C-alpha cells in the first residue's frame, strides 16, 4: 500500500534528490509516491524489487513516465521498450511453454538500431525473469528474402546490429 509503505519517507527523499534539478519538492514527491507506478519504480531503484508488472490498467505513457524519470535505461541501451510474457500450457512451444514478445506497445516504427537494442534488452529480460538462454526471432513479412522492401531491410540490419551488440 503506497500510503503506508514502511520506506515511504525514504522513497520521497530519493525522489526529491533525483529530480531536484527539475524542481521536485517534498510535497510533490509525497503526492506522487502514493501512485503505485511511482512506488514500484522507486522500489526497483532502491533494490527493494526486481521489476514491476503493469500496463493492463494503465496507459503505456503512465507506466513509462516514472521509469524514465527515476530508473533510466541499462548501459548501452538508449531506448525503452516493453515485453509481453506468455506462459502456455503446451510446453513444446518456447522455452518450456514460455514466450516473450518484445515491444508491442511502445515503438510503432523503431529504427534498425532501436530494434536491435529492443532485441538485446528483451534477451536480457528472458535471462533475468525466465532464467533461460533466449532464441531471438526478428519478424518481417518476407520469408528468407522473398520480398524486397525497406522494412525488410530494417529487420536484416537490426539483426546484424543485435548480433554485434550481443554476440
Give, region by region, the residue ranges found by the protein language model.
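Anion-binding alpha/beta catalytic cores of soluble intermediary-metabolism enzymes, centered on
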Residues: 1-167
Amino acid at each position: 500500500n503506497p500510503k503506508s509503505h514502511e520506506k515511504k519517507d525514504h522513497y520521497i527523499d530519493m525522489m526529491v534528490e533525483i529530480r531536484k534539478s527539475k524542481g521536485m519538492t517534498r510535497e510533490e514527491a509525497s503526492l506522487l509516491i502514493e501512485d503505485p507506478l511511482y512506488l514500484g519504480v522507486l522500489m526497483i531503484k532502491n533494490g527493494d524489487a526486481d521489476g514491476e508488472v503493469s500496463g493492463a490498467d494503465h496507459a503505456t505513457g503512465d507506466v513509462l513516465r516514472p521509469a524514465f524519470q527515476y530508473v533510466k535505461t541499462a548501459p548501452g541501451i538508449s531506448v525503452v521498450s516493453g515485453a509481453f510474457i506468455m506462459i502456455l500450457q503446451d510446453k513444446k512451444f518456447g522455452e518450456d511453454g514460455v514466450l516473450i514478445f518484445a515491444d508491442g506497445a511502445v515503438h510503432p516504427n523503431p529504427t534498425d538500431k532501436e530494434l536491435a537494442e529492443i532485441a538485446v534488452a528483451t534477451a536480457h529480460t528472458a535471462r533475468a525473469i525466465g532464467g533461460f538462454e533466449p532464441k531471438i526471432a526478428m519478424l518481417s513479412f518476407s520469408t528468407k528474402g522473398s520480398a524486397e522492401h525497406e522494412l525488410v531491410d530494417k529487420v536484416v540490419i537490426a539483426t546484424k546490429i543485435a548480433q554485434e551488440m550481443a554476440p
